[in-house]
């Protein structure tokens, strides 16, 4: 049963997810997935065998709107390296589609442990201002395609837009913080779109999904969350471009660490 409390909570989370997406070039999935699961619980359907798939698919659908809003705002700031986006997008879409098809077969716990470890390492390197070698640049197309496929698949399995992976990678390749975040927003939109299509198709014929679902997309939550994210993503972008690069980089490292702590807490509780 939908109540004003649920709707207002979704709007609040959508606002926060949109702002964070714009600020850090991510998709906001780390906030959206838990709140969708909470919404399903209030509807009495959290025990559905595909509840997690519904949450991830819904997260991707919301990110389609969030990341487009963020990407457009970053483009107006001339902060996106479109050549890098064009080179990485095909492999990332391929990885997302692989992830969507194989999600139900993945050892979720092992994947989450690996992801938590990776985020913690990257966060600590970012916070300690570990600088890459000046000679380090993006790899050639074969290497970039391998990275893109891996990032796309991981994004699909965990339900994120990929910014938690692509921003550190781009900064590791000597992209300035603002440029890395802007370019990541350009990469996040095709990931979100591919993930949405993947979860829509793979869940289309699954029986007994909640009323209002389209495949593994819970459409009422998509509509409410997207309204807020579209509004607040450009605000996050404007805020990011007002911050010094060092402060933005530290803030991003703190965000990664908080995501890792949250995921670890969910594993052990």
Segments predicted by a language model, with ranges:
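Transmembrane-embedded, aromatic-rich helix segments that form part
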Residues: 165
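Conserved, well-structured core segments that form the ligand-binding/active-site neighborhood
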Residues: 160
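A structural-propensity feature for long, helix-poor, extended segments
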Residues: 63-65
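Juxtamembrane transmembrane-helix boundary motif
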Residues: 1-24, 31-53, 58, 67-157, ...
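Hydrophobic alpha-helical transmembrane segments of multi-pass integral membrane proteins
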Residues: 182-200
């Amino acid at each position: 049963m939908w109540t004003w409390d649920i709707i207002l909570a979704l709007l609040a989370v959508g606002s926060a997810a949109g702002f964070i997406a714009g600020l850090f070039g991510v998709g906001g999935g780390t906030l959206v997935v838990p709140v969708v699961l909470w919404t399903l619980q209030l509807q009495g359907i959290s025990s559905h065998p595909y509840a997690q798939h519904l949450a991830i698919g819904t997260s991707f659908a919301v990110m389609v709107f969030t990341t487009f809003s963020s990407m457009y705002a970053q483009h107006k700031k001339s902060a996106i390296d479109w050549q890098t986006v064009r080179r990485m997008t095909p492999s990332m879409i391929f990885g997302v589609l692989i992830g969507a098809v194989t999600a139900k077969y993945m050892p979720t716990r092992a994947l989450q442990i690996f992801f938590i470890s990776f985020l913690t390492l990257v966060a600590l390197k970012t916070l300690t201002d570990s600088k890459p070698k000046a000679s380090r640049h993006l790899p050639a197309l074969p290497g970039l395609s391998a990275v893109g496929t891996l990032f796309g698949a991981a994004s699909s399995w965990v339900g994120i837009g990929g910014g938690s992976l692509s921003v550190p990678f781009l900064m590791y390749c000597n992209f300035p913080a603002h440029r890395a975040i802007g370019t990541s927003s350009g990469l996040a939109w095709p990931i979100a779109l591919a993930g949405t299509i993947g979860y829509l198709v793979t869940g289309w014929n699954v029986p007994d999904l909640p009323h209002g679902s389209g495949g593994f997309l819970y459409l009422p939550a998509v509509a409410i969350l997207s309204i807020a994210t579209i509004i607040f993503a450009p605000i996050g972008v404007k805020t990011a471009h007002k911050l010094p690069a060092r402060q933005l980089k530290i803030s991003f490292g703190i965000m990664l660490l908080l995501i890792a702590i949250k995921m670890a807490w969910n594993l052990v509780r």
